[in-house]
Amino acid sequence: MKVLFRSDSSSQIGFGHIKRDLVLAKQYSDVSFACLPLEGSLIDEIPYPVYELDSESIYELINLIKEEKFELLIIDHYGISVDDEKLIKLETGVKILSFDDEIKPHHCDILLNVNAYAKASDYEGLVPFKCEVRCGFSYALIREEFYQEAKENREKKYDFFICMGGTDIKNLSLQIASELPKTKIISIATSSSNPNLKKLQKFAKLHNNIRLFIDHENIAKLMNESNKLIISASSLVNEALLLKANFKAICYVKNQESTATWLAKKGYEVEYKY
């Protein structure tokens, strides 16, 4: 089956969509991606053919599907609406798998919500009658190193681990770290695409209790070596749940609200930073 992922990444959007798509992509043998070449994107790190799009036009995507005869379109993109999905289906007949994080209407054959809070009943009346709904933690897309790390009982090197995603455009990592006691050893994980990286590096230099990890190869191990995690209410939550870690989730964008609400109801520590 020829599979096309439609997804983007950038220093503004972050890396979460592409990262989880790459985990799902391993389930298929013939995979390609269609992405806009945005600033700070992960296009060069995608180990599959990438079609660089010229625009957000749905017709450009439709033409690509027709020309390359893709059989399954996987949409992981907040900018593609239910009406766009209807148009794609009408024009191409392609099978559609749609990611969803906000309990929104979709016109798809398979609906995938990988967040722990999600239930199939949430989508009654929101998706076509014959749509296959895949929801909840059992469908979580978690990298293999987390499953391996969940078996390890590591010595705790760090009092706190902070990660606000790969880009952390609001520079929350620095803000959170500066509010913690200076007697505590704090690890901060980020990426070289973080627009606030220089500020973080300067902060780490001035504080000998801070350990800054940039593009670290094994985030799972870092998390497992920490007494408490302070993480965004994103896919990091599924990873923390798998590790059975002590964590606090920070909600700072709208698409994290459902996860944050569910965590709070379950008794987990949640903080909102808008």
Swiss-Prot record:
Binding site for substrate: 15-16, 143, 234-235, 239
InterPro entries for the chain: PseG
Keyword terms, alphabetized: Hydrolase
UniProt-recorded Gene Ontology molecular function terms: hydrolase activity
Keyword Hydrolase: yes
Gene3D superfamilies hit by this protein: 3.40.50.11190, Glycogen Phosphorylase B (3.40.50.2000)
Catalytically driven reaction(s): UDP-2,4-diacetamido-2,4,6-trideoxy-beta-L-altrose + H2O = 2,4-diacetamido-2,4,6-trideoxy-beta-L-altrose + UDP + H(+)
EC class: hydrolase
EC number: 3.6.1.57
Protein name: UDP-2,4-diacetamido-2,4,6-trideoxy-beta-L-altropyranose hydrolase
Species this chain originates from: Campylobacter jejuni subsp. jejuni serotype O:23/36 (strain 81-176)
Origin organism lineage: Bacteria, Pseudomonadati, Campylobacterota, Epsilonproteobacteria, Campylobacterales
Gene: pseG
